[in-house]
Protein backbone atom coordinates (compact mmCIF):
# COMPACT_ATOMS: atom_id res chain seq x y z
CA UNK A 1 0.00 0.00 0.00
CA UNK A 2 2.73 2.47 0.97
CA UNK A 3 4.45 2.14 -2.42
CA UNK A 4 1.23 3.38 -4.05
CA UNK A 5 1.35 6.53 -1.90
CA UNK A 6 4.80 7.74 -3.01
CA UNK A 7 4.73 11.44 -3.77
CA UNK A 8 1.23 11.86 -2.33
CA UNK A 9 0.01 14.48 0.12
CA UNK A 10 -0.03 11.98 2.98
CA UNK A 11 0.70 13.02 6.57
CA UNK A 12 2.75 11.19 9.19
CA UNK A 13 1.87 11.63 12.87
CA UNK A 14 3.72 9.65 15.54
CA UNK A 15 2.92 9.66 19.25
CA UNK A 16 5.77 8.84 21.62
CA UNK A 17 6.82 9.44 25.22
CA UNK A 18 10.33 9.10 26.67
CA UNK A 19 13.50 8.40 24.77
CA UNK A 20 15.06 5.23 26.13
CA UNK A 21 17.48 4.59 23.26
CA UNK A 22 19.18 7.95 23.73
CA UNK A 23 19.10 7.52 27.52
CA UNK A 24 20.91 4.19 27.22
CA UNK A 25 23.49 5.70 24.86
CA UNK A 26 24.27 8.48 27.33
CA UNK A 27 24.31 6.22 30.40
CA UNK A 28 26.83 3.88 28.79
CA UNK A 29 29.04 6.72 27.55
CA UNK A 30 28.72 5.61 23.97
CA UNK A 31 31.14 7.46 21.74
CA UNK A 32 29.36 10.09 19.66
CA UNK A 33 29.18 9.33 15.95
CA UNK A 34 27.83 11.37 13.00
CA UNK A 35 24.43 9.67 13.19
CA UNK A 36 23.71 10.32 16.87
CA UNK A 37 22.24 13.80 16.45
CA UNK A 38 19.74 13.09 13.70
CA UNK A 39 19.29 9.45 14.68
CA UNK A 40 18.21 10.35 18.22
CA UNK A 41 16.01 13.30 17.32
CA UNK A 42 12.38 12.50 18.17
CA UNK A 43 11.28 14.34 15.04
CA UNK A 44 12.83 11.54 12.98
CA UNK A 45 10.19 9.07 14.20
CA UNK A 46 7.85 10.84 11.78
CA UNK A 47 10.30 12.47 9.37
CA UNK A 48 12.26 9.33 8.47
CA UNK A 49 9.24 7.35 7.17
CA UNK A 50 7.98 10.47 5.36
CA UNK A 51 11.41 10.74 3.73
CA UNK A 52 11.76 7.03 2.96
CA UNK A 53 8.28 6.66 1.48
CA UNK A 54 8.33 10.11 -0.19
CA UNK A 55 5.22 11.38 1.60
CA UNK A 56 4.58 15.12 1.16
CA UNK A 57 2.02 15.83 3.91
CA UNK A 58 2.66 17.20 7.42
CA UNK A 59 5.17 15.10 9.36
CA UNK A 60 5.47 15.49 13.11
CA UNK A 61 6.21 13.66 16.31
CA UNK A 62 3.86 14.31 19.24
CA UNK A 63 4.86 13.98 22.90
CA UNK A 64 2.06 14.69 25.36
CA UNK A 65 2.98 11.85 27.74
CA UNK A 66 0.27 9.17 28.07
CA UNK A 67 -2.01 10.87 25.55
CA UNK A 68 0.62 11.16 22.78
CA UNK A 69 -0.92 8.70 20.32
CA UNK A 70 -4.47 9.99 20.69
CA UNK A 71 -3.32 13.61 20.35
CA UNK A 72 -1.45 12.57 17.19
CA UNK A 73 -4.71 11.01 15.97
CA UNK A 74 -6.64 14.19 16.73
CA UNK A 75 -4.10 16.32 14.84
CA UNK A 76 -4.19 13.97 11.86
CA UNK A 77 -8.00 14.07 11.72
CA UNK A 78 -7.98 17.86 11.78
CA UNK A 79 -5.29 18.00 9.07
CA UNK A 80 -7.42 15.81 6.79
CA UNK A 81 -10.53 17.87 7.55
CA UNK A 82 -8.83 21.20 6.78
CA UNK A 83 -7.14 19.91 3.63
CA UNK A 84 -3.53 19.94 4.88
CA UNK A 85 -3.26 16.34 3.72
CA UNK A 86 -5.44 13.85 1.86
CA UNK A 87 -4.76 10.99 4.26
CA UNK A 88 -2.42 10.32 7.17
CA UNK A 89 -0.54 7.59 8.95
CA UNK A 90 -0.91 7.71 12.74
CA UNK A 91 1.44 5.65 14.86
CA UNK A 92 2.06 5.06 18.53
CA UNK A 93 5.39 3.85 19.92
CA UNK A 94 6.28 2.69 23.43
CA UNK A 95 9.45 0.64 23.85
CA UNK A 96 11.05 0.07 27.25
CA UNK A 97 14.74 -0.09 26.39
CA UNK A 98 16.25 1.21 29.61
CA UNK A 99 16.14 0.20 33.27
CA UNK A 100 15.89 3.94 33.97
CA UNK A 101 12.20 3.70 33.12
CA UNK A 102 11.49 1.25 35.93
CA UNK A 103 13.78 2.96 38.43
CA UNK A 104 12.14 6.32 37.88
CA UNK A 105 8.53 5.14 38.05
CA UNK A 106 9.32 3.02 41.11
CA UNK A 107 10.86 6.05 42.83
CA UNK A 108 7.64 8.05 42.47
CA UNK A 109 5.41 5.14 43.49
CA UNK A 110 3.73 4.79 40.11
CA UNK A 111 4.50 1.11 39.46
CA UNK A 112 2.18 -1.55 40.81
CA UNK A 113 3.82 -3.67 43.51
CA UNK A 114 1.39 -6.47 42.70
CA UNK A 115 2.37 -6.35 39.03
CA UNK A 116 -1.24 -5.81 37.95
CA UNK A 117 -3.44 -2.84 37.05
CA UNK A 118 -6.60 -2.69 39.17
CA UNK A 119 -8.36 0.33 37.70
CA UNK A 120 -11.43 1.56 39.63
CA UNK A 121 -10.66 -1.01 42.32
CA UNK A 122 -9.69 -0.76 46.00
CA UNK A 123 -6.66 -2.95 45.19
CA UNK A 124 -5.21 -0.33 42.83
CA UNK A 125 -1.56 0.29 43.70
CA UNK A 126 -0.10 1.65 40.46
CA UNK A 127 0.27 0.55 36.88
CA UNK A 128 2.35 -1.93 34.88
CA UNK A 129 4.08 -0.58 31.77
CA UNK A 130 3.77 -2.34 28.44
CA UNK A 131 5.43 -2.14 25.04
CA UNK A 132 4.00 -1.84 21.58
CA UNK A 133 4.06 -0.19 18.18
CA UNK A 134 0.92 0.34 16.12
CA UNK A 135 0.11 2.26 12.96
CA UNK A 136 -3.12 3.04 11.10
CA UNK A 137 -3.89 4.87 7.86
CA UNK A 138 -6.65 7.48 8.09
CA UNK A 139 -8.68 8.47 5.04
CA UNK A 140 -11.96 10.32 4.55
CA UNK A 141 -14.76 7.74 4.76
CA UNK A 142 -16.11 8.41 1.27
CA UNK A 143 -12.65 7.89 -0.24
CA UNK A 144 -12.06 4.69 1.73
CA UNK A 145 -15.42 3.35 0.52
CA UNK A 146 -14.69 4.37 -3.08
CA UNK A 147 -11.26 2.71 -2.95
CA UNK A 148 -12.68 -0.51 -1.48
CA UNK A 149 -10.42 -0.31 1.57
CA UNK A 150 -10.99 -2.58 4.58
CA UNK A 151 -12.45 -0.19 7.18
CA UNK A 152 -11.67 -1.17 10.77
CA UNK A 153 -13.36 1.81 12.42
CA UNK A 154 -14.81 5.25 11.79
CA UNK A 155 -13.68 8.25 13.85
CA UNK A 156 -16.73 10.39 14.51
CA UNK A 157 -15.09 13.04 16.68
CA UNK A 158 -12.19 13.88 18.96
CA UNK A 159 -11.06 16.58 21.37
CA UNK A 160 -7.93 17.62 23.26
CA UNK A 161 -7.54 19.64 26.47
CA UNK A 162 -5.01 20.24 29.23
CA UNK A 163 -5.98 19.85 32.88
CA UNK A 164 -4.68 23.30 33.78
CA UNK A 165 -3.66 23.98 37.38
CA UNK A 166 -4.18 20.99 39.72
CA UNK A 167 -2.60 19.61 42.92
CA UNK A 168 0.56 18.82 40.94
CA UNK A 169 1.67 18.99 37.32
CA UNK A 170 1.01 15.25 36.91
CA UNK A 171 -2.36 15.19 38.71
CA UNK A 172 -5.39 14.88 36.40
CA UNK A 173 -8.40 17.17 36.59
CA UNK A 174 -11.70 15.29 36.73
CA UNK A 175 -13.55 18.47 35.75
CA UNK A 176 -11.44 19.02 32.63
CA UNK A 177 -11.63 15.35 31.68
CA UNK A 178 -15.42 15.63 31.79
CA UNK A 179 -15.21 18.73 29.57
CA UNK A 180 -13.03 17.02 26.97
CA UNK A 181 -15.40 14.05 26.85
CA UNK A 182 -18.37 16.36 26.29
CA UNK A 183 -16.47 18.22 23.57
CA UNK A 184 -15.61 14.96 21.80
CA UNK A 185 -19.24 13.81 22.00
CA UNK A 186 -20.41 17.15 20.62
CA UNK A 187 -17.90 16.96 17.78
CA UNK A 188 -19.12 13.46 17.00
CA UNK A 189 -22.76 14.54 17.31
CA UNK A 190 -23.57 11.65 19.65
CA UNK A 191 -25.06 11.31 23.13
CA UNK A 192 -23.26 9.73 26.11
CA UNK A 193 -25.87 6.98 26.32
CA UNK A 194 -24.89 5.88 22.81
CA UNK A 195 -21.38 4.97 24.02
CA UNK A 196 -20.90 1.23 24.36
CA UNK A 197 -17.29 1.11 25.54
CA UNK A 198 -14.84 3.47 27.24
CA UNK A 199 -11.11 2.79 27.53
CA UNK A 200 -9.91 4.80 30.50
CA UNK A 201 -6.47 6.04 31.49
CA UNK A 202 -4.91 3.24 33.51
CA UNK A 203 -2.59 5.02 35.95
What are these regions (language model features)?
Residues 1-203:
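Condensing-enzyme catalytic core of the thiolase-fold
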Amino acid sequence: VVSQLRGSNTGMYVGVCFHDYQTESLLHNKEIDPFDGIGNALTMLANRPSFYFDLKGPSLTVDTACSSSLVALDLACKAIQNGSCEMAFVSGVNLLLSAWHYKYFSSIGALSESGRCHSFDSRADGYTPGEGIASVLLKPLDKALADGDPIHSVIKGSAVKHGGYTNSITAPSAKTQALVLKEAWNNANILPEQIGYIEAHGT
